[in-house]
Amino acid sequence: KWFGARSAEEVIGKTDFDFFSREHALAAFEDEQRIVETGQALPGYEEKETWPDGHETWVSTTKLPLRDPAGRIIGTFGLSRDISDRRRAEAQLAHYAEELRHRNEELEEDLEMARELQSALMPRHYPCFPPAATSAESALHFSHFFNPSKAVSGDFFDILPLSDTTAGIFICDVMGHGMRAALVAALVRALVEELKGIADAPGEFLAQLNAKLTSILKQAEMPIFASAAYVIADTAKNQLRYANAGHPAPLCIHHEANAARALPLDRCQRGPVLGMFSGAQYGASQRDLSIHDMVLLFTDGLFEVEGAGGELYDQHSLMRAVNGRVNLGAGDLCREVLTEIQQFSANKQFSDDVCLVAVEVERLAS
């Protein structure tokens, strides 16, 4: 049947040259001659045949020397097993693997573009206060660290020049990781830009941001949220004004007290995360601002770090680290705290998205 014969008699006395292509038959003949000459079997090799109608078949063949009772080689014999289905399945798998590789390459290219775009959205140059001042003369100095755990991140920050003497510092952390979180972070950034007109009122700013974000996410049926903190440093009024949306409380280093503490909320609770409750309200608090005071805003990836023994670097650990370095400038303090946490980590690096922003008061306008 394999050769298209109706009975065994039709194949008796015929050779490979009667059934296969000349190339195939010659190769088989040479193999058999070598077996006769050497006595060495030819186990499990694969043969391909293209038939006159164009279809292809594969067999796994084992050929051995045929010996007479005295042990002399008088010919060869063999067994062939049809493996055409297996080879077709392997070819199909190879095709799927190549297709998957191509799609992965496209995905990697898209992720790289997304990473570059997200990087471009982050502040590359810090604003000066007033704008005509050099970075050394600016009333406010900034420093930041941004480390996505994947190609892109749900962490985001922005620095908003509200006047010649006032800056708004916004930070948020979108639930989850990767592309999904990064897309929502980009949406939050666009909304922050849209709401700059009310950015001098922290509570109202977060309330409007939440209302718009919640509306969009509900339409998209995306169960996702973001925590955020917003701090205004006003060097004309010597004042910090701030509001919080379910975010870790920023730390303020008071130069006169030579100590850091979490920014407290005045007669109001921390507001809920953004994107969950459309009518949420956010109370604003304020504190006096002195020269050389510093405020640190950060996402929870900075302190939710596990050590080699399973112990956790928590907010209390972070507070101790900052209090041990209150005499350093913003840049040096950030670098040393980050180094301490990375050295504490079991794998010496951050496993979550991390964003840290510091603002230091160099001079007051009043």
Language model feature labels by segment:
Residues 96-296, 348-366:
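… and, occasionally, acidic/histidine-rich disordered N-termini of signaling adaptors
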Residues 1-76, 141-151, 157, 161, ...:
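PAS/LOV-family and closely related PAS-like sensory domains
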Residues 229, 285-297, 302-366:
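C-terminal catalytic subdomain
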Residues 61-64, 72-82, 170-172, 298:
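PAS-family sensory domains
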Residues 17, 67, 84, 175, ...:
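Adenine-nucleotide cofactor-binding loop residues
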Residues 68-72, 79-95, 176:
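PAS-associated C-terminal cap
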Residues 2, 9-23, 190-196, 273, ...:
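PAS-family sensory/regulatory domains
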